[in-house]
Curated annotation (Swiss-Prot):
Site (Important for acyl-CoA specificity): 111
Protein's name in the database: Homoserine O-acetyltransferase
Keyword Transferase among UniProt keywords: yes
Organism expressing this protein natively: Ruegeria pomeroyi (strain ATCC 700808 / DSM 15171 / DSS-3) (Silicibacter pomeroyi)
Recorded catalytic activity of this chain's protein: L-homoserine + acetyl-CoA = O-acetyl-L-homoserine + CoA
Amino acid sequence: MPIKIPAHLPAYDILTREGVMVMSEDQAARQDIRPLRIGLLNLMPKKIQTETQFARLIGATPLQIELSLIRMTEHQTKTTASEHMEEFYRPFQEVRDEKFDGLIITGAPIEHLEFSDVTYWDELGEVFAWTQSNVHSTFGVCWGGMAMINHFHGIRKHMLDHKAFGCFRHRNLDPASPYLRGFSDDFVIPVSRWTEVKQAEVDAVPELVTLLGSDEVGPCLISDPGHRALYIFNHFEYDSDTLKQEYDRDVEGGTAINVPINYYPDDDPSRKPLNRWRSHAHLLYGNWISEIYETTPYDMARIGLESTDLRG
């Protein structure tokens, strides 16, 4: 089954050309099934790029997905056309009475700020609390994941001496997890951040389970069953050239930046980078969607009140 997105959303044509099954709202209305309703709270400045990256992953599953784009209510983006935001996005305050099977909260390039200094921090706290009554499963990504784990468990983010930047080897720490079906024992994931969460602080919270980790860049994917949440601090969703774009931007802007580790062939920025994480990206987000399908109530009014495991 395809992902349902507006026909005029830029991701629609991009994903159609890539062979991803997409359908318009008119086409979806003719199918007599309940799609999984997934929200994307997009905090990234490059809205269209981020929309497309996540739509690509959740649209590759055999289930019909209805993707809803959400923004913070008062925050005004400076890097995406206001016409795009008005046509495709709804403010959080407008959707807060609705229910979602899943919610992705993206990262944001504000990791140098204390959480309390973020202009929309108070409303984001409302979002986190809202997920416990209105969302069946929430996926916090990079800064979004660090913000969630801080909100629910008080775990801090720590500044690094230098940016963790490149493709780092990670280990599968819990092969029996339903989120890791099909995962190799070891693989690479793109990393691009100035902060980290420390494994010792995660281990001090008994209800948290580290699923993926790296000796070089620490914990990557954490399961929080009590809050029906996953936190990932790295970027499976990245396109093949996303790290290149970030590197070229900093070089052109005169910002000191190292060549991303283990990304370019022979670490040569003049050569085309190879995508070595795509299959695991599809596995992770496909497994997440599958787990939602297995456990979310058919009656959306019951979301936040019960879990209905179809495997029972």
